């Protein structure tokens, strides 16, 4: 409702969603491709900016796609757990005697990340402007979709609880001698024990297994 009245507002809304998810989803490909992209694509199609019709790309879809790509990179750089390669940098720094915590990374990345967050959509809006500037129907569409989805389910509440537990442990885990890897397994265990996820879900996450193998 706040961001949905213009194409620029939609860009900021999608970027904000990415930033909010980044601390607890340490895979920028899963976050960008699996969560943000389907939402962004649905928005574009709702305004007749269709991937299969090149003549409609510039109406809205191209702008939102480029913006989501850059916002994903910005969100990934702001948090230690924003992408899988960040903990590797932390390890390399530790080998040089430099201790980087979740909080110190966030403190260093917050200001440049925040500046980029506000500047990038505006720059893209000037350099690669969408043909559609006003999207007044977006809030109504969102409200209708929320109504169709119904109230938040028990599993969604449990997922939200796990999100905040993980975020808290990643931030304060150092003081409790709980490292980031242990925190990730705690979160996975909670989701499995509460049946939010099944082992079949875990096995089907090919991207996560790729990350474990290649970044281990």
Residue ranges and their predicted role:
Residues 1, 44-53, 131-144:
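Flexible loop linkers connecting adjacent transmembrane helices
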Residues 95-100, 104-216:
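Hydrophobic transmembrane alpha-helices of multi-pass small-molecule transporters
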Residues 1-7, 49-56, 83, 127-129, ...:
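Phosphate-binding glycine-rich loops and adjacent basic patches that engage nucleotide phosphates
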Residues 2-78, 84-96:
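Hydrophobic transmembrane alpha-helices that form the pore/transport pathway of multi-pass ion
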Residues 78-79, 85, 112, 190:
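Short, flexible micro-motifs
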Residues 26-27, 75, 82, 101, ...:
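Residue-level detector of functionally special positions within alpha-helical transmembrane segments
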């Amino acid at each position: 409702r706040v961001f949905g009245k213009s194409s620029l507002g939609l860009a900021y809304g999608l970027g904000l969603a990415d930033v909010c998810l980044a601390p607890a989803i340490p895979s920028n490909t899963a976050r960008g491709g699996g969560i943000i992209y389907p939402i962004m694509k649905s928005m574009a199609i709702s305004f007749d900016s269709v991937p299969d019709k090149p003549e409609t790309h510039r109406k809205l879809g191209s702008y939102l796609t480029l913006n989501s790509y850059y916002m994903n990179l910005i969100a990934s750089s702001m948090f230690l757990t924003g992408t899988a390669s960040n903990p590797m940098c932390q390890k390399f720094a530790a080998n040089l005697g430099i201790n980087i915590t979740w909080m110190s990374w966030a403190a260093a990345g917050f200001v440049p990340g925040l500046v980029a967050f506000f500047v990038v959509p505006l720059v893209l809006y000037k350099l690669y402007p969408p043909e559609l500037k006003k999207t007044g129907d977006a809030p109504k569409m969102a409200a209708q979709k929320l109504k169709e989805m119904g109230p938040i389910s028990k599993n969604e509440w449990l997922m939200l609880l796990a999100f905040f537990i993980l975020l808290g442990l990643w931030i304060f885990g150092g003081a409790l001698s709980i490292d980031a890897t242990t925190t990730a397994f705690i979160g996975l265990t909670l989701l499995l024990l509460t049946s939010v996820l099944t082992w079949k879900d875990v096995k089907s996450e090919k991207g996560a297994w790729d990350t474990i193998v290649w970044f281990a």
